[in-house]
């Protein structure tokens, strides 16, 4: 009974099928929007270094971790083991929580920038907030599908 339960659920894809399965297809969009967040925050003025430092940490950490995971999935490093399904679900739940906190803090930092900063820097931060919330949504959706896959594995 235990081997059937371990092999009966969804497994992680390997090779280029990573780009054709629903939750793993979101890696591409997480990569794009996460990269845009840290590029925009890095290019703008930083009114609150501690707040935007957290935003930078979260966006760069998730960018590097997402890149690492997608490369490991493409080369098939997981070998079909269920522990990787658990890792995938745990990572995406943590990333979703971190990105939500970073999005709220970036919005707070942007609100405080209304006066005394250039129009360009203010709009860069507005774009960073929008892309940060999009990245948060992507990580939440990926986390939900990863938890469903984890439960069925």
From Swiss-Prot:
Keyword Transcription regulation: no
Record topological domains on the Cytoplasmic side: 1-24, 76-92, 148-153
Membrane-spanning residues: 25-46, 54-75, 93-114, 126-147
Segments in the Extracellular topological domain: 47-53, 115-125
InterPro entries reported in the protein's UniProt record: MAL, Marvel, MARVEL-CKLF_proteins
A single BP term in Gene Ontology: apical protein localization
Domain MARVEL: 18-151
Keywords noted in UniProt: Cell membrane, Leukodystrophy, Lipoprotein, Membrane, Transmembrane, Transmembrane helix
Location relative to the cell: Membrane; Cell membrane
Pfam families in the cross-refs: MARVEL
Any one GO MF annotation of this record: lipid binding
Disease: Leukodystrophy, hypomyelinating, 28: A form of hypomyelinating leukodystrophy, a group of heterogeneous disorders characterized by persistent deficit of myelin observed on brain imaging. HLD28 is an autosomal recessive form characterized by developmental delay and nystagmus in infancy, followed by significant learning disabilities and progressive motor deterioration within the first decade.
Quaternary state and interactors: Interacts with PLP1.
Family annotation (PANTHER family): MARVEL-CONTAINING POTENTIAL LIPID RAFT-ASSOCIATED PROTEIN, MYELIN AND LYMPHOCYTE PROTEIN
Designated name of the protein: Myelin and lymphocyte protein
Protein source organism: Homo sapiens
Record lineage: Eukaryota, Metazoa, Chordata, Craniata, Vertebrata
């Amino acid at each position: 009974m235990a081997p059937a339960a371990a092999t009966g659920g969804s497994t992680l894809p390997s090779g280029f099928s990573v780009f054709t399965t629903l939750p793993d297809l979101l890696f591409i969009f997480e990569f794009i929007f996460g990269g845009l967040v840290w590029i925009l925050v890095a290019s703008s003025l930083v009114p609150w270094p501690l707040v935007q430092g957290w935003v930078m940490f979260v966006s760069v950490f998730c960018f590097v971790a997402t890149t690492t995971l997608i490369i490991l999935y493409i080369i098939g490093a997981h070998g079909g083991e269920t522990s990787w399904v658990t890792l995938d679900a745990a990572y995406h739940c943590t990333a979703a929580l971190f990105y939500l906190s970073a999005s709220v803090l970036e919005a707070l930092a942007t609100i405080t920038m209304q006066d005394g900063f250039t129009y360009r820097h203010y709009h860069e931060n507005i774009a960073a907030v929008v892309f940060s919330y999009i990245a948060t949504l992507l990580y939440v959706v990926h986390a939900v599908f990863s938890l469903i896959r984890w439960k069925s594995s």
